[in-house]
Amino acid sequence: MTSSAAAIPARRRPGRPRAGDTVPDREQLLEAAVRIIRSDGPEVTMDDVAAAAGVSKPIVYRNIGDKDALVAALAERFVDQLDEAVERSSAVGVGGRATFVASMRAAFEVIDADRNLFLFVTAGGPGTESVRRLVDRSSSRMIEQFTALRTAAGLDPLPARTWAYATVGAIQVVASMWLRDGYGDRDDIAEHITQLMWPGLTTAE
């Protein structure tokens, strides 16, 4: 074997980092995905995410999974944002209708501020795993709150689960149409949803 032949480096396998490269971890890859979605819109591809992270697509797949796994992971993050905002809005301790409408306003504020991420995680529709998980997490707190509200008022708590799902569904669909058509003020939209939902929550009929 000649010295020149011995100097030829081993070929790097696809998806493997170059020598000396630092491979982003899963959290850093998710951050890169969020950045590119926020800047380029909800139609970004896995190739776009890889480019934003400065890695090959196989590295993204190895650390996150496929597109569905990415959507599911970012849906969890988005629900965390919603939960934090709604919890802050409820911490004022006013209670009743004022707290309900404040939570609706908080949800729409988060959606408005991060609209591309919202559209990305809800793009698959209600039949997708990511949206089902989003609904389950978003509604769990409402089920507890609606049950407590009805019980404290001496009313049947049975409808609480249905109304929680209905409220989450209303937020999702109304927000999608609002972002698409740009109609109305977000606080007015929150008030409109409250006008529809609140009477059922607080009456026996």
Labelled PLM ranges:
Residues 1-13, 144-151, 177-205:
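C-terminal peripheral helix-coil segments that are non-catalytic and often amphipathic
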